[in-house]
C-alpha cells in the first residue's frame, strides 16, 4: 500500500542477500498461511462490492469511497499478493521483464490508490461534520465519482517512472535480469520523497482531520444532551388529566390542563362546555411533515377543543389521554395512554432526507356540535393557548429528533472511519519506519523483519472489509443475507 512497497524486499541492494530455495520445506507452512490470507482478502472485498451493488440502502455517496478502497484492496489480494508469494518461492525472477513490470505497476498503483481512497474518505467525513449544510449541496455522486477518478489518475502516474525511468534519468546501476526491481531501486532521494508524499503527509493530514471530526461530533453530542434535558420526549408530550385524588393546588399554580378543564360560567350560570354525551368533531388543523418533493410523510391532527370536557370529568377516570391514531389520521381517546407508535415508525431515511422542512398548514379553526347540542363558545382561549404551547414543544422536539438522527449517522460514520484509519496506520507504519531506516542505512536490512512489515501492510487489505459490517448495520445485514446467516 505504499510507494516503495513489497518489491523492496526483493529488489533493493540493501536486501540483496534475500535468497530462498525453490519450494523449500521450511517455506511451505508460511506459503499456506499467506495463500489463505490472499484468498480471504479476495473473497471479502468481492463480498463488499457485491453487497454495495445488490443493496439499495448502500447506494450512498459515502459508500462510493468504500467501493474505491475495496477495488484497490481487491487488486492487492488478486494480483500483488499471489505474485509476491510466487517470487518468495523462487530463488530468482524467471517470469520475464514484462510480467515483472506489470506486477510492480499493480503493486505501486493499488497501494497508492488505497492510501488516497482512505484520504478522500476522511475529507468527506470531515466536511460532512464541519460544514453539513454547505457540503450537502456539493456532496453528490457525480462529484464523488470525479474525486475518486482523480485519486486513481494520480495513482496511475506511478506507471511513468516504473516504465520510463531510463528515458528521464541517467541509469546509475546495472539492471539485474534475475531480479524483479524498478530502475530507481537504489535512488534514495526519490524513494524518500515519494514515501513522504504517499504516506507520511496523507497520514498526518488524516490524523488532523479525524481529530477535528472527533471534536465536532463530541461537541454535537454534548449539545444534544443538554437539549434533551430541556425538551420532553414524544412519550412525555401528552395531555395529563386532572389528578383523580383531588390533591389541593396552591392558588395561581394551576396547570394549563386544569385551567382548560375548568368549566367557565356564562351569564346565566350555565356551563359553556357541552355535556359528555356530545360527540366531538376533530379540529381541522393538520400538521404536515413534508419533504422537498411535497410528498406527505405523516400527519398529526390537533385534538378538538371539545374533547377538553372529556369522559374523565364524567367517569372519574384518570387514564384518559389524547392519542394520535396514524392509521385513521385522527385523534382518539385511548385509555391506555398516549400512542406514540406512529411517530416512532417514521424511518430514519424519511426523516433524514437531503433537504427537509417542517410546515404547518393552518386553517380556520371551527368547532361544531351535533344539531341540538349547543355550540362551543369562544371563551376557550386558554385551551387554544395550551394547544399552541404543546405544538411548539412537539415541533421543537421533532427538529431535535431529526438532528439527533443525523448526528447518530455521522457518529457511526466517524466510528467507521476511525477503525479504518487505525487499521491503516497500525498495518503500515512499521513498514515505513523500517523503510526510512534502511533508506539511509543500507547495511541495516533484516530480511525476516522486512518481509513481516510488508505482509503486515498487505493484511490491511484483508482487515478493511471486516471493518465495514462491524461499524455499519446495513453492511452487517446485507452480509448476513448474502451468506444466508440467520441472526
Swiss-Prot record:
Modification Phosphoserine, positions: 230, 344, 347, 380, 396, 398
Residues that, per the record, bind histamine: 107, 112, 198, 431
Listed result of changing residue 458 to F: No effect on activation by histamine
Cross-referenced Gene3D superfamilies: Rhodopsin 7-helix transmembrane proteins
Primary localization class, coarse: membrane
SUPFAM superfamilies linked to this entry: Family A G protein-coupled receptor-like
Gene Ontology molecular function, alphabetical: histamine receptor activity
Keywords: Cell membrane, Disulfide bond, G-protein coupled receptor, Glycoprotein, Membrane, Phosphoprotein, Receptor, Transducer, Transmembrane, Transmembrane helix
One GO term of the biological process aspect: G protein-coupled receptor signaling pathway, coupled to cyclic nucleotide second messenger
Subcellular localization, as worded in the UniProt entry: Cell membrane
Segments on the Cytoplasmic face: 51-64, 124-144, 212-416, 470-487
Consequence when changing residue 431 to R: Increased histamine receptor activity. Constitutively active
Effect of residue 57 to A: No effect on activation by histamine
Chain ranges passing through the membrane: 30-50, 65-89, 98-123, 145-164, 189-211, 417-440, 447-469
Listed result of changing residue 59 to A: No effect on activation by histamine
GO cellular component, one term: cytosol
Extracellular side of membrane: 1-29, 90-97, 165-188, 441-446
Matches recorded under PANTHER family: 5-HYDROXYTRYPTAMINE RECEPTOR, HISTAMINE H1 RECEPTOR
Record-stated family: Belongs to the G-protein coupled receptor 1 family.
Protein name (record): Histamine H1 receptor
Source taxonomy: Eukaryota, Metazoa, Chordata, Craniata, Vertebrata
